[in-house]
């Protein structure tokens, strides 16, 4: 099944809800970055949470999330847009612990760390950026997105994200949900939401069992008939890097730096952090970039 995201309204229009299956997307991220179990879970959760923030944006806007904890994984970066395109990377892809956490799951909190910051940069187009930042409160990532939305954007939300990793480090299931209360929600509605959230199985297990974004939202809303589906968005790992972009980056280094690349290295190789694609620049190509540099 191809990955996709569903946007809907629930609870008589008093809650905005999103759910996504991201299994194939996170499989692609794992393949590109050769991530081990805990790094895979942390990267997959971050990418899925970022996907939801991207889905809240207008057509030409982009969102970048950076989670910088004090754990061995190091900074995690993901970006997404309103079209369901997502990419991400983790500083240390090779984190695996032989022990599970007290809940019998991969110890993502230990990998990410419990001290640090979650930063969100919204590229609003026209060269305008909005930046929000909140401390890491959990290291489990879903709770950290929830705290960010409540604190920085003043939206009471619940974010659940999960990745099921096989013993051979391949990805079995990935996805998540996000629920946001809208103004006017009554105490009765809030009680019902809390009851349904408590009864919800873990996201990765639901997806492993074959649940779809629609069926996850039906569980969250207390029935299919209580959902008003607004939009279905295909989701995929997409990177917009190119040799031209890296060429521009090399030009920005200045003539001295480019000259040393030519004379000492006789060329250059650039690698994209997000997708691991590499771009080779010959001496001749560097000479052309040298002429364009200041």
Swiss-Prot record:
GO terms for molecular function: protein folding chaperone; unfolded protein binding. One of its GO terms (biological process) is protein refolding. Its main location: cytoplasm. It is found in: Cytoplasm. The keyword Amino-acid biosynthesis does not apply. It comes from the Bacteria. Disulfide bonds join 239-241, 272-275. One of its GO terms (cellular component) is cytoplasm. InterPro entries: Heat_shock_Hsp33, Heat_shock_Hsp33_C, Heat_shock_Hsp33_N. Under oxidizing conditions two disulfide bonds are formed involving the reactive cysteines. Under reducing conditions zinc is bound to the reactive cysteines and the protein is inactive. SUPFAM superfamilies: Hsp33 domain, HSP33 redox switch-like. Keywords: Chaperone, Cytoplasm, Disulfide bond, Redox-active center, Zinc. Belongs to the HSP33 family. HAMAP family: HslO (MF_00117). NCBIfam families: PRK00114.1. Redox regulated molecular chaperone. Protects both thermally unfolding and oxidatively damaged proteins from irreversible aggregation. Plays an important role in the bacterial defense system toward oxidative stress. This is 33 kDa chaperonin. It comes from Listeria welshimeri serovar 6b (strain ATCC 35897 / DSM 20650 / CCUG 15529 / CIP 8149 / NCTC 11857 / SLCC 5334 / V8). The gene is hslO.
